[in-house]
């Protein structure tokens, strides 16, 4: 007998075959079960304690999973799913996990019957293509200029969130903000950059009803010399700079030998003249407000206040970009390059207000702002954080609608229609792929079933009634009213989903399920390469062949 050959080192742990499939599916199901109860308007909240002892109370799928620390690699990739969904379309983070978990769950039976994973994946991909075709068939277009329709959609998105009691207000805020920053690219395309140009400023205190969308920008800064500079300017001329207004330090150290006392004064005078020069270049454009991202010396401050110009220093780059978009200014890198066209004249009002203990600067009433700020008020920090998460989702939905103005029914109606259509289609599929295809069709029912569970109605009775209504492929708009658990027409109840979100949910869930099914080996315990400077490494002995050519000394 030959001695067994060890290929992998002892420290490596290797699992393969059915054990891996089973482990992956169990891990994915566990993740899906954690957030299953947060789907729909009657969803539960989760309270998470982080390492620092802070508390997060939320029902946003992505926010919950982000806080979790999981060990299993498959569970990690499931969590990555909701993050992708959040970045792509901003909503549907819970649905995508529930759907992917269900897809894997129904695949388990086939793996036990020794179906090859590739066969299951092929059937799943076919089911995905057909489900997107069904979406295209039942989608209806809306007019994005009709505010009431867009409002209905955004409201049905927020209806599932913690702040649903303030649905109208958040929906209004989201639509106002996204329509403000929308830019027409021509050919019917619109670009809406939520991350860059919409800032959410959270200020605890006051009532939630005090929240508003500012047609402009606000930031947590005061003018440099509050006593001497104006804190309120109507129709200000604004100059934005990206350079320091203080004496430039030398790049490398220089020594100057001072022989007489006057030499010292000459040096100081040079510094003063340098700053005065910069200020004169700026002041000849008669600005009312100068904002710089870098420092501003006391001397420059003196010249500005003497000329009646307000100044703000050390502003964040992102805020500066927003101000530029809002008032039409151009950020300038050197004062001597300033032109009349760089000055922002689009703002109607600059003022500094005290909210709570902090001073905030407002540049508002802009004529055609392409950036805006959502000011959120509320009783506590936790409350405002949750409102912000919901607002981000609502803005994403509004953005999706502006980009692709198509709706599909909500309340699980879309999934039931897809499921019914795929079941009918599975009869025409030949060969072994028929069964996994049919299973995928059944898996789509996980969403309406979860909705019914969270409402507390009789799940079996409700699902049977719904399946009966959808079996003939008609009335695609029949679904569950998430608040009452009753079966209703989604068109009448105005429960809608964005086409983009649904399509992305299906694609992400099924592709992820296929990816996890294809994994048949998990090797753990692979050594990390030591990072530079992270600790003593063993001395390496170079032979002459290894040594770099430069290190070989000439004979």
UniProtKB/Swiss-Prot annotation:
UniProt-recorded name of the protein: T-complex protein 1 subunit gamma
Task: Report which gene this protein is encoded by.
Answer: CCT3
Task: Tell me what organism the protein belongs to.
Answer: Arabidopsis thaliana
The superkingdom listed in its UniProt entry is Eukaryota
* UniProt GO MF annotations: ATP binding; ATP hydrolysis activity; ATP-dependent protein folding chaperone; unfolded protein binding
* Organism placement in taxonomy: Eukaryota, Viridiplantae, Streptophyta, Embryophyta, Tracheophyta
Q: Which family does it belong to?
A: Belongs to the TCP-1 chaperonin family.
| Compartments, record wording | Cytoplasm
Where are the stretches annotated Disordered? 527-555
Q: Which controlled-vocabulary keywords does the entry list?
A: ATP-binding, Chaperone, Cytoplasm, Nucleotide-binding
Database matches in SUPFAM superfamilies: GroEL apical domain-like, GroEL equatorial domain-like, GroEL-intermediate domain like
Q: How does it assemble?
A: Heterooligomeric complex of about 850 to 900 kDa that forms two stacked rings, 12 to 16 nm in diameter. Interacts with CCT8.
For this record, an example GO cellular component is:
plastid
């Amino acid at each position: 007998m030959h001695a067994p050959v060890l290929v992998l080192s002892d420290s490596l742990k290797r699992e393969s075959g059915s054990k891996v499939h089973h482990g992956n599916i169990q891990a994915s199901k566990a993740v899906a079960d954690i957030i299953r109860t947060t789907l729909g308007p009657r969803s539960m909240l989760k309270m998470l304690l982080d390492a620092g002892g802070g508390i997060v109370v939320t029902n946003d799928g992505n926010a919950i999973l982000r806080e979790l620390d999981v060990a299993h690699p498959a569970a990690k990739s499931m969590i990555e799913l909701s993050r992708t969904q959040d970045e792509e379309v901003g909503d549907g983070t819970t649905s995508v996990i529930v759907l992917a978990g269900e897809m894997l769950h129904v695949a388990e039976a086939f793996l036990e019957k020794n179906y090859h994973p590739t066969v299951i994946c092929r059937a799943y991909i076919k089911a995905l293509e057909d489900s997107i075709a069904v979406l295209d068939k039942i989608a209806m277009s809306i007019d994005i200029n009709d505010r009431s329709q867009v409002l209905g959609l955004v409201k049905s998105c927020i209806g599932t969130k913690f702040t649903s009691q303030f649905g109208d207000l958040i929906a209004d805020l989201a639509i106002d903000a996204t329509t403000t920053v929308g830019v027409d690219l021509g050919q019917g395309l619109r670009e809406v950059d939520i991350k860059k140009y919409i800032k959410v400023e959270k200020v605890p205190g006051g009532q939630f009803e005090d929240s508003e969308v500012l047609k402009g920008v606000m930031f947590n800064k005061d003018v440099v010399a509050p006593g001497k500079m104006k804190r309120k300017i109507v129709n200000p001329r604004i100059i934005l700079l990206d350079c320091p207004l203080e004496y430039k330090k030398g790049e490398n150290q220089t020594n100057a030998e001072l022989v007489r006392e006057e030499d010292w004064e000459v040096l100081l005078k040079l510094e003063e003249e340098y700053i005065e020069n910069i200020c004169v270049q700026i002041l000849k454009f008669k600005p009312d407000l100068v904002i710089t991202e870098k420092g501003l010396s006391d001397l420059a401050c003196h010249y500005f206040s003497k000329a009646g110009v307000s100044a703000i220093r050390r502003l964040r780059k992102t805020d500066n970009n927003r101000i530029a978009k809002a008032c039409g200014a151009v950020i300038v890198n050197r004062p001597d390059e300033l032109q009349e066209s760089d000055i922002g004249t689009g703002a109607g009002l600059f003022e500094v207000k005290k909210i709570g203990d902090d001073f905030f600067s407002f540049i508002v009433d802009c004529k055609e702002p392409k950036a805006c700020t959502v000011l959120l008020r509320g009783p506590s920090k936790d409350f405002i954080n949750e409102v912000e998460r919901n607002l981000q989702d609502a803005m994403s939905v509004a953005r999706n609608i502006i980009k692709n103005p198509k709706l599909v029914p909500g309340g699980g109606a879309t999934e039931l229609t897809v499921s019914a259509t795929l079941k009918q289609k599975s009869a025409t599929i030949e060969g072994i792929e028929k069964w996994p295809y049919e299973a995928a069709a059944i898996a789509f029912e996980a969403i309406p079933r979860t909705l019914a569970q969270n409402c507390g109605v009789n799940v079996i009775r409700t699902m049977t009634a719904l399946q009966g209504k959808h079996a003939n492929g008609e009335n695609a708009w029949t679904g569950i009213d998430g608040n009452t658990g009753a079966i209703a027409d989604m068109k009448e109840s105005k429960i809608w989903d964005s086409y983009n979100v649904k399509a992305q949910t299906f694609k992400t869930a099924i592709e992820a399920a296929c990816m996890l099914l294809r994994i048949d080996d998990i090797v753990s315990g692979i050594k990390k390469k030591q990072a530079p400077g992270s600790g003593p490494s063993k001395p390496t002995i170079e032979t002459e062949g290894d040594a770099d050519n430069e290190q070989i000394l000439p004979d």
